[in-house]
């Protein structure tokens, strides 16, 4: 991590976990009593909501809006914090499913808000190294101005769902870190997620990250270009691709009157293609599909053509 980020990472501030989900669960235990709430992004991955529910913790949202890029209204977030203080602020960098990285002003604004209102910052950065463009990006891991908990893991870095090892880095003002680690150590001691069987394999797995990320990122970028081409070739021209800046998926926008469930189930039934409907992620409106970019290139090309053709056919059926 020190080599990757170009900074000194203190191993005493690192926790090994069985998964990032476990990291979330630990942090919810650390900061929340039953009935407390955390702030999470919307659109966003539903896993955080599910984990919060299991800890009897509520979830409220701050919002990303699309204006040619996904943007966070930091001013609106400040207004929220002025009326109610969450137990923690969750940031997904880059976001899933939007694929948007925090912009410099957003990053600075969120750090300042956490400082002003004494709110811990939870940064989920599992997709950080899968940049699909040359957009500015900066990790929150290692942030020193506010109490920060950065999550990352092998399963995303290796694109290997079975590689269930994750890590949590604590950073921030020394006294706040000390107080948090006293309690976090107790939680870690209660769960003991690691064993010698797992840690013995870590060096070789960590060594493989660089080349694996490069291989996967190359596929993601090529598949994104294939999807762009298919959208551009649409017979009806009613679809838009909301360009991701990073991550493993892309959002396809289509007319909202096309039922997402019907579209997804018909793709599974008739073409053996699986995509995720937008409402899985609390998209602001109907008419979205989240499409994986991880497929083998030849599979991706055929699948993208089938999805676009299916939507074109639905639109044409209403016009003629």
Please report, for each region that a protein language model flagged, where it lies by residue:
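Phosphate-binding glycine-rich loop
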Residues: 1-37, 257-261
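PLP-dependent aminotransferase-like
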Residues: 29-91, 104
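Hydrophobic residues in well-ordered beta-strands that form the structural core
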Residues: 40, 61, 123, 275-277
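Helix C-cap/helix->beta junction micro-motif
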Residues: 55, 84, 116-117, 271, ...
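Active-site phosphate-binding strand-loop segment of PLP-dependent enzymes
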Residues: 68-137
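PLP-dependent enzyme catalytic core of the Aspartate aminotransferase-like
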Residues: 79, 266-275, 281-320
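Conserved core segment of the aminotransferase class I/II
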Residues: 142-221
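Conserved glycine-rich beta-strand-loop-beta hairpin in the small C-terminal domain of fold type I
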Residues: 203, 218-228, 240-253, 285
């Amino acid at each position: 991590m020190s080599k990757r980020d170009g900074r000194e990472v203190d191993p005493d501030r690192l926790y090994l976990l069985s998964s990032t989900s476990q990291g979330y669960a630990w942090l919810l235990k650390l900061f929340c009593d039953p009935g407390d709430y955390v702030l999470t992004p919307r659109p966003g991955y539903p896993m955080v909501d599910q984990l919060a529910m299991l800890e009897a913790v509520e979830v409220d949202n701050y919002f990303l809006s699309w204006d040619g890029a996904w943007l966070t209204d930091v001013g609106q977030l400040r207004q929220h914090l002025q009326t109610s203080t969450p137990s923690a602020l969750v940031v997904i960098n880059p976001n899933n499913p939007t694929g948007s990285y925090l912009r410099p002003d957003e990053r600075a604004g969120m750090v300042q808000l956490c400082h002003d209102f004494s709110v811990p910052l939870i940064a989920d950065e599992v997709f950080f190294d899968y940049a699909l463009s040359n957009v500015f990006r900066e990790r929150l891991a290692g942030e020193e101005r506010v109490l920060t908990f950065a999550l990352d893991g092998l399963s995303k870095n290796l694109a290997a769902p079975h590689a269930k090892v994750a890590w949590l880095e604590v950073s921030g003002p020394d006294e706040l870190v000390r107080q948090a680690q006293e309690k976090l150590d107790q939680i870690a001691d209660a769960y003991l997620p690691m064993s010698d069987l797992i840690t013995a394999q870590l060096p070789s797995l960590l060594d493989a990250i660089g080349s694996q990320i490069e291989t996967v990122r190359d596929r993601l970028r090529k598949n994104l270009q294939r999807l762009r081409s298919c959208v551009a070739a649409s017979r009806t021209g009613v679809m838009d691709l909301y360009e991701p800046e990073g991550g493993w998926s892309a959002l396809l926008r289509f007319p909202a009157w096309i039922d997402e469930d019907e579209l997804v189930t018909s793709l599974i039934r008739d073409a053996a293609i699986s995509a995720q409907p937008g409402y899985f992620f609390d998209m602001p409106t109907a008419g979205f599909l989240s499409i994986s970019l991880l497929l083998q290139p030849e599979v991706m090309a055929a699948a993208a053509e089938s999805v676009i053709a299916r939507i074109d056919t639905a639109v044409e059926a209403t016009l003629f």
